[in-house]
Every structure is written in C-alpha cells, then in structure tokens.
C-alpha cells in the first residue's frame, strides 16, 4: 500500500480536481456509493447485525437454568436430590426452509412465500449443555447439539436470504425482480417493512429549563445498559424554583434534589452523595465544583449543603433513601440493603452495576449537578430536545433484538416449568419436548404481522404501527417506504416544535418529503446519502484511550479536573486528558485509516466546555463528506480515474473510505466541522470567506430524499409544492416492479406506455426512475381554451387517449382457502347448487367451472361469483330422525366487488401452510382516462380531466403540433412553481437536441438564460411561446401561448373507483338508517350543516323528507294518558297501555326510528320521556 503512495508523490498540483471537472467527478463518487450501498443498506446492515451479533449475545447473556427437585421425605435418611444445569450456547441459523405437511423440507424462495401466503423464515438451532450434578458422583455432561428453538423471519436481500449475491439472470429465473431493493420481510404472504423509530439518546445528560413547575431547571439522564433487556432507568437532578410551591420558608436559595428510580420522593442531592460514601462536605464539593476559586457556583450549592446538614453518616443517608422506597423494609438493615441495591443496580446503570463503582457514579452525578449549575448561572446553553444529535433511530436490528430478548426469556421460563414437573416426580426430562418452538416463531410473526411491537398478551402497552405493509404503488413509493422514519409522539398533540424542520436535519433527512395533515413533520424520510450506524463495541476505543495517557477517574485528584478535558464514551464519563488536541488528531487519523476505530464512530470535541465525546452506539444518523486538508480536497484525480474503471479494477466506495478521502460524519460531529458547499469555495480568492475548511459536500442535491429527487428544478419551486409532489409521486402509476405479471398483489396499477422523462435529475439514475418510470412526456399548453379547464382541471386530447395516452390496467386479487372448522364442518371449493345450498345470492353462478373456480379469460362484472365455496351444515339432533334434509350445505362464495368489471387474468391453485387447498384469482380491467380522473405534473400541480376534445378541435401550431393537455394559466402565478415552466423549456430543447435534459437542483451550469439561448438556436421563441390556431375556427389565437413537453403523471384516484349513488339499499340493524360507504352501497349523509342550511331556507317539508321519510320512518303507538309507548298488535287491532289499564285512548305517532330508540334507551336508564299527544 505504501509503495503506491510513494509513486504518487509527483507534482501534487496536476492531480487536483478542477472545478469544471468536478461537475462530473462528484457524480462518479456518488455512483460508486450507490453501487456499493444501494438505497436500503441501513435496513440490511441493521438486520445482519441482529442475526450475527445480537441473537448470540442474548442467548449467551441468559443465565443457565438451575433446577433441583424438592427433597422427598422418604422413610429413613433424606438424600440430596440431583441438580440439573442447562446452558444455551452457540446458535446456528439455517437457510430459509419450508416443511410441507408430509415433513419434507425444501428451500423456500421468496416468491413462493408470497404466492402461497407463507412466512419467509429460517430455522434457528442452538447447542445446549445439560449438566447433572449428583452428590458424591462426578457431574455428568451431555451436549444436545443443534436443537431447534424457533424460526426467525428473514429480511429479503440480507446476508441470510437466498437471493443474496445472485446475478440478475438468476433472480429472473426465480421470478424475482432484479431492481427490487429488498429490506422487507414476508409474513403470511404479505410484505412488511419495519419503520425506523425515533427516540431520545440514552446515557447522555440533558439540561432543560422548566416552565410553570416547582423546578427552575432539570437535568436528566436516561440510563441504559448496553445490550441488556433492562428497561431504561432515568435519573433527574432538579433545581427548585425560587418561591416555588415546594420551597420551604426556612430554606434560603434554591435547593437541588434528585429523583431516583424506585424511590417515591425526591432526595436532596447531598444525601445521595453521602449514601455513595462521600461524607465530608469538601469531598462532595470536589466532585461537583472542580474549581474552588468559583464563588458563584459555591454559593449555588450552599442551600443544598445546609439542608443535608442533619445527615452526616453513610448509613443514615442510606436509611433516609431506603425509607422512601416503594415498599420500605421493616428493619433498618433491610432499608439500608434496599437503598444500596437501588444505588448500585438502578441508579446510572450504564456507569456500572458491579460493586465498587461508587467513585465513578459520584463523579457522574457530580457532573450532572455541575451541568445544572452551569445552566442556572447562564454559562452554558440549555439542550435542545429536537436536535437530531440527541436522537437515535431504532431500525430492524434493535427492534427485533428487543422482541427476541422477551421471547427467549419466555422460552426459558417454559422450559424451566416443564422440566421442574418431571424432576419433582424423580424422572429425567426430554429437552426437545421441553422447548416450545412456537414461542419465538409466533411471537416474532405476530409483531411483524400486526405492527404491535411487544408481547401479544400486553397488546395495549405495545407500540403500534412499527411494521407496515410495503407500499407497492410505484417503485418510488416502495423505496421511500423503506427509508421512512417515525417519531412516536401522539399525532393529536398540537406541538409545533417537534414537527418543524430543524437545522441539524441538513443532509440527513429530506426537507420536502413529509405527509400533509396530522402527521406532518413527525413522519420523515432519509436523505439519499444518509446512513444509520449499526453500532460497534466501545472496548477497543477504551483500550486505546488507556494507552494514550488518559487518566482514569479512580486515579485522579478532583482538583485536576478543572484544567483537563473530560472524555465521554457513549455518554459515560471514562476519564480526563491533558492534551485534547493531539488526542483528537490521533483518533481522527485512526478512523480514517480504519485502524482500531470503525468508520461510523463519531468524535466530538467541545472546546468551550472542555469535553471530548465519542459515540459508537447504534442508531446515529450520519452521511459521507469529502475531507479537506490545507484548503485542498484529499480526493484527487487518480481516485476518480480509478473509480471510472471500477468494473475492471474492483476499486469501490469502500476503498475511498479506507484511503481516508471520505468519512462519515454524524449530526453532532457536523457541528464541529467547517463545511464547504462546493470545491469552488476552496479556491483561493481575494476575499476568502474562510480559510479553515475541514470538509466539503459531495453534492448539495443529496440533501433531498427519494421522492423529492424526482422533481426537476426543485430549487425553483415554492417549498410546499415540493412537499405536495413528494406525496403525489407515490400515487403515480407506472411499472411498480418488473415481475408484476407473476405476482398476485391485492391492488396493482400498471401504465400501458410509461416513458422516461425528457428532463431528469442526476439522482434519478440511482432511484431507477428511467428503468421503471411513472408518467408520460406530454405536450402541454398553458392556455384558457373554451373554459373547461377552470379551477385546476385540464383539457385532454381525445384522439391521444384513443391511441393509448395514459391508458392503464388495474389488477385486483381475491384469495380464498378451504379449511376444516369442526369435525363435521368443512369448507370445500365447488359449484354450489340451488337444491342443496342454503343462502345463495341472486348472482350468476354459471361462470364457475366444476371445481368451483372461474376460468381465466372469462369476463366478469359486479357481484359475479368468482370462487364457489360451500360449508357443510352441522347436523342437529332433531334432524337425524327425518331422513330428507333439504339443505346440507351453506354457500360462502367470493363475489367480485360490486362496482368493478374486468376479465379473469390468472388463477392460481396451491396448498397453504396447513396443507389445505388455497387459491388466488387476479382480475384485470383496463382504465382509459376519462373526465374526472386525476393527473399531475412533477411540481405539485394536480388537476382533474375537465373535458376531452378530439384532435381536430384542439389548437395547433404552425408545425401542426397539437397539445395533449391544456392547463389553465391561473395555476401558475399564485403557486410560484417556476420549475414547471423551466422544465417545459428544457423539455423543448431536449426534444430538439435529442438528448436528455439535466434539471438537477443547485446546479449552476444550467440556468434559464442558457436554456432560452439554446431554444432560440433551434428557431423557437426564446421563452417557449408559440402562435396557436383555434381548432374550432382555424383562426389565429390573438395571444402567444406557452407550449412544450412536460412530464405528467396519472394518479391512482379515478372516477370509476369513486362514483357512487343510491336510491334504496341496505340499512343498519340498530337504528334502521342507511349504511355508510360506497362498498356497502350506503347512503349520503345529510349532516348537521346541511340541516342548518335548510332551516335557514325555511324548506320545512324538504327537511322532513330528508331527515325522516327518506331515512328511518317508523310508527309508534302512544298512550294519551301517560305518554309512554303502548303495546300494539296491528294484526288483531288490539292496543293497550298496561300502566294506565287503558285500551281505548291510544294514538298513532310517526317518528324517526332513531328517536324511538333513544327514548327506549333513556327508559332503560330510568328516565321517562313522555310524548303527550295534543
């Protein structure tokens, strides 16, 4: 490696990358990144970390199961029963396998799992050592090798997936799409994604100011032991507010109190120190205030010292804490023991849970108090909850590890219960039978299938929506879904702060892509080059620091701290160092050489506060930046040349990182670097803005996410428009995946003739938007022509539509399976007959074949039967005597959706997991654009089709070009989507030039002036205006019209799926009002506001008809004397009111059924509404 470097020592200046070369060079670097990483690497790496490290760690951390039978009181001497020890050791994960009902294993391919509704999972095996210890004999050890303990769902395209490392050709043979990124699971045939969950970083001290509470300031530390199942235990150190509710009259100044886990009341901070064994005031102050020459701070601590003056010994302090515990011990010894336990195990567990951690804990606690005092004195800024460096993202790895830990614990519990039963009877037990494999398999499957993250039994406590069904509308929507982030804040909270775009999100999270409405700003998406760390062990770093003259906290005198720099590793204070500058340089050098330190570790030096923080934990969001030294990029031309030939020389992104040219910087470290936006900023100028750059952006357009990268010229649009397009781009039709013909998706839209856009951004290459586009380049004119394009509607060219413009096909799949409910109830596919079947609908059963399934190619329409299925009726005792039962079966067939028509496209019959017959049927229907369908450009300019004119009625240019779409000029000024206009110009140039136009954001090489000049070179008007002729009259239209090719998308909202009306139809059982919703053929609600309007109109009869006659009319008989509903038998014309013994004076009242129901419900609660007839 060194020889190569020496050869390269020739003239450095020739090797620099010139700014004009940089335009191409940066994209070569970006391409190498995506070639190696892909777009879902953060999901795959996290899952691999779980399989390779976490599972083994969880299994090893579990204590061995120690069993002993209860002593049997036999006659004579009592012999010591044998002890059994079970230890779980090495784990093995096999390839994804499926066992058929006959028990034959076969490798399971993902597409088979999708089609047969199976779970794509791999079996997990473990070595178990069983030791039998009998008194007086030597212990007997038996190894149970590779015992099956459950199945783990496998993420597609991860290391353990069967598709990993296959070529495109192999993938095609397996019916998989080579472009599919993976990163999701297949659970019962449906694709599930794990959404990254945001949380506050653990083990870090935060100080916040409290408003309107008894505290002025609070410091908190959510402390969590690395890789353990223990819940986080939080400790708060707070300063009471002046004259607050909690202030005692006698106490002068502001006291400082701590809230400890499992201790009900707050404990004065000095008492906590004394309980840790630091008794003298001087000792305590040395741990809090490192510099005794600081009178202000000493003054702040004085009230706290005065308060704790009464308690001077450690045991008294421990007793003070113990007596405030959850259940205080009876004796003093018990209370002291309890307090010791809490301080050792529950307070700040990340500092240490073993014995003799008191010094470290005292220092950390002192640090917390010190930070609190600094904030109170205004010497240090308060922390920011929304700073992204204070956040961690839980991806598949940590989420699954959390679940697996719980499941494994349950498994061990069950094994213990099972084995104990046998041992108590004096027998040995069978290990294979003791392990309930369903616990792990079903537990993981349940959480992934429902999204309730946690134990099934405590479903209400679990987080909901962690796992979601992968969105397969467009390829972009799939990619975007795999890179989504979620903040678990209640959606109903009207808090603006967490929803706002924070400065620290630059380059990490897309600024445009977030949903509108209640989840705005809480659901985010990763920027293109952002990556989430998977976490590494801090031990090598700690060892390195030991060698590099870091002084341990146990060994120093507290006075030394004031001048030295504190070192934190993952939030835990490990020591101090005298020469921080040199230490940081060494650490950086090591990280860039990828020696000892992994490239995703972040190192922050806070010079003002004299702290160095090193983080190696999982879930930090980071991104690659180019390293600058002495105002020059370390990336040289030779690197670019090697990357250009990466097909031949295997030089990749990884080599760039290894040669120390690029490094990953996370949000916290980003605040300590000086970033140049382009290498141009590094050039020597007369007035240098900055001469200490340390890093340079690769390309500023990488701050955008998947959906925003598809927008051309997003830097020329008003920002909410980019947000609207990011949402609409996910609903556009296109080819969502190349193997759609072999998939049986519930819903799928496929465009007939998708085109790649004439105007693209460079980022689109990596999103595969050219291979799987979702739209058509249509000629768009901006004009008001006949007025049928007002209010965001568009006029379309009927002739173009007839030629296939924006025509699409819609697939819907139906699934059904046979099963056995009881011993006599079984469901079977067959063609039901009216003679033997009960409950058959008025529908056409003739299209079914004899096996009960419809044949492919048959045309079907609403309410036709597509799967015939019957269930045998159970035989009642009474019917056994009479031999001739009319009905032996009940019909439970599947019908086509009411409002749909189509042709049966494909029928698949197979066996499911239980070995029952199982079928899926796919129906296709052609959707031709019609009035009311929704279209949109790539700039948030959505519109519906207002009318379609034939080609001869459309305006035309002198060249004979007619537009496909005419949009209204009013759509532009107020929305300021200038990108839409520039795209049109650029598209016009591209069409003439015959090459794809570049519309990458923040690109100085392309501007409107340059495009306009090119356009005028081709003989067009500078700004794209043309003379148009009226299609109806043939006359010249007086004004010039802006016309050119613009990329349009057809969205999934179509009139055929929404049109709905009802005259009469089904009603609800309870209140006899019409059903709700199109799928149930429901009514249209005449709501409160509509009612108010009719009252204002004075249209009383109409109002009565809507709210009564057309809804739920009903007749009630009412007793004239008491006004309560009477008993009426209309057949025999007998009426009576039992209460009044009245049979004659009864009136008939008409009222809504809902009103009658309300009166009866009130009566059931002993309120009597009386209807007095006048």
UniProtKB/Swiss-Prot annotation:
- Matching InterPro entries, A to Z? DNA-dir_RNA_pol_su2 (IPR015712), DNA-dir_RNAP_su2_dom (IPR007120), DNA-dir_RNAP_su2_hyb_sf (IPR037033), RNA_pol_bsu_CS (IPR007121), RNA_pol_bsu_protrusion (IPR007644), RNA_pol_Rpb2_2 (IPR007642), RNA_pol_Rpb2_2_sf (IPR037034), RNA_pol_Rpb2_3 (IPR007645)
Task: Indicate the principal place this protein occupies in or around the cell.
Answer: nucleus
Annotated binding of Mg(2+), by residue: 792
Q: How is the cofactor bound?
A: Two Mg(2+) ions are coordinated by both the catalytic residues and the nucleic acid substrate to enhance substrate recognition and catalytic efficiency.
Does Phosphoprotein count among this protein's keywords? yes
Q: Which residues bind DNA promoter?
A: 409
- Segments forming a coiled coil: none
**How is the activity of this protein regulated?**
Pol II enzymatic activities are inhibited by alpha-amanitin. 3'->5' exonuclease activity is stimulated by TFIIS, whereas pyrophosphorolysis is enhanced by TFIIF.
Phosphoserine, modified sites: 937
Which parts of the sequence carry N6-methyllysine? 1052
Cofactor(s) recorded for this entry are:
Mg(2+)
Q: Name one GO molecular function term.
A: hydrolase activity
Its keywords, alphabetically, are: DNA-directed RNA polymerase, Hydrolase, Magnesium, Metal-binding, Methylation, Nucleotidyltransferase, Nucleus, Phosphoprotein, RNA-directed RNA polymerase, Transcription, Transferase, Zinc, Zinc-finger
Zinc finger (C4-type) residue ranges?
1119-1140
- Residues recorded as binding DNA template strand, renumbered to this chain, are 456, 1078, 1085
Tell me which residues bind Zn(2+): 1119, 1122, 1137, 1140
GO cellular component terms, alphabetically, are:
membrane; mitochondrion; nucleoplasm; nucleus; RNA polymerase II, core complex
The keyword Secreted appears for this protein: no
The role this protein plays is:
Catalytic core component of RNA polymerase II (Pol II), a DNA-dependent RNA polymerase which synthesizes mRNA precursors and many functional non-coding RNAs using the four ribonucleoside triphosphates as substrates. Pol II-mediated transcription cycle proceeds through transcription initiation, transcription elongation and transcription termination stages.
Subunit comment: Component of the RNA polymerase II (Pol II) core complex consisting of 12 subunits: a ten-subunit catalytic core composed of POLR2A/RPB1, POLR2B/RPB2, POLR2C/RPB3, POLR2I/RPB9, POLR2J/RPB11, POLR2E/RPABC1, POLR2F/RPABC2, POLR2H/RPABC3, POLR2K/RPABC4 and POLR2L/RPABC5 and a mobile stalk composed of two subunits POLR2D/RPB4 and POLR2G/RPB7, protruding from the core and functioning primarily in transcription initiation. Part of Pol II(G) complex, in which Pol II core associates with an additional subunit POLR2M; unlike conventional Pol II, Pol II(G) functions as a transcriptional repressor.
Q: Member of which family?
A: Belongs to the RNA polymerase beta chain family.
In Swiss-Prot or TrEMBL terms, this protein is called DNA-directed RNA polymerase II subunit RPB2
